[in-house]
Amino acid sequence: MEVKKLEFIGPRVMPGGQKEMDYFCQVPEFQQRCQSGNAVVIPRRDQVADGRGSTGKLFSQTLNTADTIPHCIVMFEDTYTAQSSTQPWLPISTCSVFYQLGEGVCGFGNICHGGIQTTLLDDVMGVLGVLNARLQDGIIPSKVPGAYWPRNNPGMVDLTKSLFATQGIEVKFLRPLRTPQVIEVSAQLVDMDVSGGSFTVQCVIRDMKGKQYAVANANWVIHTPRPRSRL
């Protein structure tokens, strides 16, 4: 009897992401998340040296071992819609990072340490900012060429020449997060200050069945370097 394979409509995979994509596609729930034609996948540990911490040693070395976080990948939806709002806004408002957690991130027994969970929550919030900056800069090509250039979008906050950092974060742990397992950490833009100088993000840790383990709310500030005055 011939077995018909279901056609897999995968996401757009950015350079360097295929190896991690192949790994996570072994997880059925991840495959389901990839069915959207707007999904874009990029490596969390990449080689783009744009000074935004994406290749910092915490994730590229310290947590990049077989028993800590051997695999991780970023996913977001490229669903560009032209806006004419004069209120501050960003190209994408949500993203997810999938992590394979090993036993080396545990603080007691097989329970992931709360400090590691907080680090992951903060990390994904930062990834959301980096994705927006790279879409604006064209480092990540958009489905519609030039769609996310700030000069073409009134009210869009330009992150291409800005630095952004956590100002404050509040974390609530809901239940023990056991390892090893694959988790999804999702960040959602909640609000932007009317001045465009800060934004609020909510982030959630879930297992691949959708159960929540930790929730964080954080304020992020945007630092735009002032032009040097001429003597």
UniProtKB/Swiss-Prot annotation:
Which parts pass through the membrane? none
Protein name according to UniProt: Verlamelin biosynthesis protein B
* Keywords from the named record: Virulence
Q: Which residues form the signal peptide?
A: none
From the UniProt record, report the name of the gene that encodes this protein.
vlmB
Q: What does this protein do?
A: Part of the gene cluster that mediates the biosynthesis of verlamelin, a lipopeptide that exhibits antifungal activity against plant pathogenic fungi. Verlamelin is a cyclic hexadepsipeptide and is bridged by ester bonding between a 5-hydroxytetradecanoic acid moiety and a carboxyl group on the terminal Val of amide-bonded tetradecanoyl-hexapeptide D-allo-Thr-D-Ala-L-Pro-L-Gln-D-Tyr-L-Val. VlmA and vlmB are altogether regarded as essential components in the biosynthesis of 5-hydroxytetradecanoic acid.
For the null mutant, the annotation states: Leads to highly reduced verlamelin production.
Q: What metabolic or biological pathway is this protein involved in?
A: Secondary metabolite biosynthesis
